[in-house]
Amino acid sequence: MQRHRPLGQVPLSFSARHTARWRDEMDEQTRLKKLRWRCRRGMRELDQLFGRYLDQRWAQAPDAERAVFLQLLDCEDDKLWRWFMGYEACPDVANAALIADIRALPA
């Protein structure tokens, strides 16, 4: 019977340098998967907008912008919908700027 190694355990043949890089890549992949799951909303349109941001901007976004994006994910869907569609102005300036940037991303 073959024993499987636990998830996240590094094969012994990897050098220390490769091990650290592998772990960092795995951590980033795991974080991105969890973030993509958080982006799933009750509305397909919001799913598409947030997914577009993850695909096109997240990797190169500065930490401050990432923090604003995470703050947006904590907002209620109905508020997000009204802000993204322009029915209401977002009261937070940083959120409003990121919403405008996300709306401007190509489909």
From Swiss-Prot:
Localization per record: Cytoplasm
GO cellular component: cytoplasm
Family of this protein: Belongs to the SdhE FAD assembly factor family.
Gene designation: sdhE
Its job: An FAD assembly protein, which accelerates covalent attachment of the cofactor into other proteins. Plays an essential role in the assembly of succinate dehydrogenase (SDH, respiratory complex II), an enzyme complex that is a component of both the tricarboxylic acid cycle and the electron transport chain, and which couples the oxidation of succinate to fumarate with the reduction of ubiquinone (coenzyme Q) to ubiquinol. Required for flavinylation (covalent attachment of FAD) of the flavoprotein subunit SdhA of SDH and other flavinylated proteins as well.
InterPro entries in alphabetical order: SDH (IPR005631), SDH_sf (IPR036714), SdhE_FAD_assembly_factor (IPR050531)
Disulphide linkage map: none
Record flagged with keyword Chaperone: yes
GO biological process: succinate metabolic process
Protein name: FAD assembly factor SdhE
Record's keyword terms, sorted: Chaperone, Cytoplasm
